[in-house]
Every structure is written in structure tokens, then in C-alpha cells.
Amino acid sequence: MAGVSVAEYLGQRTDVDDLQINPAVVGAPCPFMDGRKCHKKIPVCSIRNKGKLWIVCENRLCSSKKTISDPFNPRRKLKLPLSSYQKKVLLEIARVSFSPHLQFEHVAVKREVPLKANDQSDYSADFIMTLFEGKTALSGPDRVVLEMQGGGETSNTGEITRHLIAWAENPQRTNEILRQEIPKVGTIETNAWRRQQEQFFVKGNVALMTWKGYGIIFCVGELLYDYIWRKIENKAVLPTLEEHNWTLAFLEICEDEEQPSTPGPLPLKIGRRLFTNYQTFVHALINQGEPSLDAFAGEFDRLDGSTVNIQRDGY
């Protein structure tokens, strides 16, 4: 295992040296939300693995949190306004998914929306997105479940913590030290996608069964997009339905390397995209594995302690 490096620290990219990054104070404001403090002790927003971005903070890509505690009455919840950053992200998603001509006033969202499931489990959509009239003459669904998964957890997280503590305590600290490779740490795409699969099946079904049938959009980071594509690329021919009646979209959120390198957050963009049929994609997901005759034949242990060799044909 090679390692990872810190890409963003409390909203500041680490790969530029124009502005010296200093250790964050407890309760510093989150740079990606309005009126919210950073909840992390070590405020790393994203890391790089083999040069590709992996988001490790739930608020970095586009937080769906809709309320905040009243500072004067903690039992009371106040509506949390969307930040300018969140609005830009959501507008870009809408432009790619519906029409490139949309403006802020055309797009409407609901956040943390409860969804019904047969097993009584609690599910909620990150966002429900539609146009302000609730319907559209454009191709694709009128309304969609919108899910955000820019990354997830890492292995050996303690190594990242130790690196950040050593950097913070170093009186000669620099951005270069902050972005040094942290060995023996990796991203865990398998866990990130495994956690999302149940959500994917339930929320996608809810969207398709509602009214005349809606759709679902997954915004995922570059490494997760790579992982999902490897799972299904040889399992099915997925129709490209961007200009037709798509019910599922995968949008890759990646670093916009064409933008100038200036202090602040890393600029993001929508890279690869897949607009297709939800049911066809589900079939590709479950159509994993191949016939494994050797697994069902050969030497078996009998319960009396002896062994028996069973042939493939059962005789």
C-alpha cells in the first residue's frame, strides 16, 4: 500500500504555497455551509490517492443538512439556508441532468426527505430535485432523488491523525509538510459502495414507483465512479439515454484541473456521466459471478471424520 496525502484542510487546498495554512481552531466555521461550525477535530475535507480526489467529510461535496440548533434554545431547530457554494453545486447538477440553460430560480430542492420502505427501516433522500413547476417537457424524469457520495472512509485513519498532529505541533510547519504522502493509508471504495447499495435499491425503487415514475441521480467521486464501473462494465450493455427517458444517472464529481491553482477550496466539476435505465443497471449489479464447478466438487469432510471425493456430476 502506497499512501495518501491531504488535499484540503478546512477548505484550503494544500498544493499551493501562496497562503500558509495554520492549524484550525475548535469551532471554526465550515467553509462549505452557512452558519455551521466544522464538527471534525481534524478538519480534513479531502485526500488524494494516486492523484485522485477522495472526499472524507460529509459536508464537502454538498451537505443535505436542513436544520441547525438555535444557539439560544437548543431544543428548537432553525432552518439552515443553502450556502452559495451548495447552490452552485446543485445548479450545475441540474444543468447537466435537465438543461444547460437553467438558472437558480428554475431549480427547486427538498433536503433530508423521508422515504417509505416496506421493512419499516428509516430511509431518507439527500435531496429531491425538480424544476420549479414540478414537471418538465425535457427528456428524463420530472423529479429525482439526488444522492451525494464523494468518497468515504480510509484505512489506518490513525496515521492521518498522527500526521496532522505532528504538522500542527511543528513550529516550522509548511504546506509542503502538510501535503506529504502518508504511508500505509488507503481509500476503501468497497465499503463506500457496499453501504450505498441498499440505499440505491430502496431509493431507486421508491422513485420509480412514485406517481408516473421518477428517477435517481448518484453524484460520486472519481475513485468510486471507477469502482462502480469496474463492477458492471462487462456485465450488461447499458443503454445511453441522456436524450431519452432515463431513470438513473451517475455523475462523477472530480477536480477541475483546468482552473488556476489559487488558495481556497479545490475547484470541482462534473466529469464522466452515465444516463441509463435503472432496471438494466440493477440487473448488471446482481449479475455477478460465474459458474464455479470446482467449488461444488472435490474433497469434502464427512461428519464422521472421514473424507469423500465427490465428482462434478454427483457420482
Label each residue range with its predicted role.
Residues 141-142, 213:
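A general structural motif
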Residues 1-35, 168-315:
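Non-catalytic C-terminal interaction segments of nucleic acid-processing enzymes
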Residues 1-117, 284-315:
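Nuclease-adjacent, charged terminal/linker segments that flank catalytic cores
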Residues 148-169, 186:
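Short beta-strand-loop-alpha-helix junction that forms the active-site gateway
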Residues 112-114, 120-131, 143-149:
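Short acidic loop-to-beta-strand element that houses the catalytic metal-binding Asp/Glu
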